[in-house]
Design a protein with these regions (language model features):
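Active-site hotspot residues in diverse enzymes, especially metal/ion-binding acidic/histidine motifs
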Residues: 1-86
């Protein structure tokens, strides 16, 4: 995927959610978010459980990093679901 295509995808997500907040975007695209307090090293994990997409985010991170990790997990959801389903 080209950088231009990634940029367009991001702009489409923002327009559809009417927000740049990755948590609102996740809600708009059906990605469930769960904060996890007992992650020690991991910042976030994306997985599909019973056909429902989930992003688990380390609750010990500061708010800025939580937003970054959420956006990263949205990328997994939109671009790499095929790898998770294997």
């Amino acid at each position: 995927m080209t950088l231009q295509r990634l940029y367009r995808l991001g702009e489409e997500l923002v327009a559809n959610a009417n927000s740049r907040d990755p948590f609102q975007i996740a809600d708009e695209i059906g990605l469930q978010i769960q904060m996890v307090k007992d992650f020690t090293v991991l910042k976030g994990v994306y997985m599909i459980l019973h056909e429902v997409p989930w992003a688990f985010i380390n609750d010990n991170l500061d708010d800025r990093m939580k937003r970054i990790v959420c956006a990263h997990e949205i990328g997994h959801h939109l671009l790499h679901q095929d790898l998770v389903r294997q």
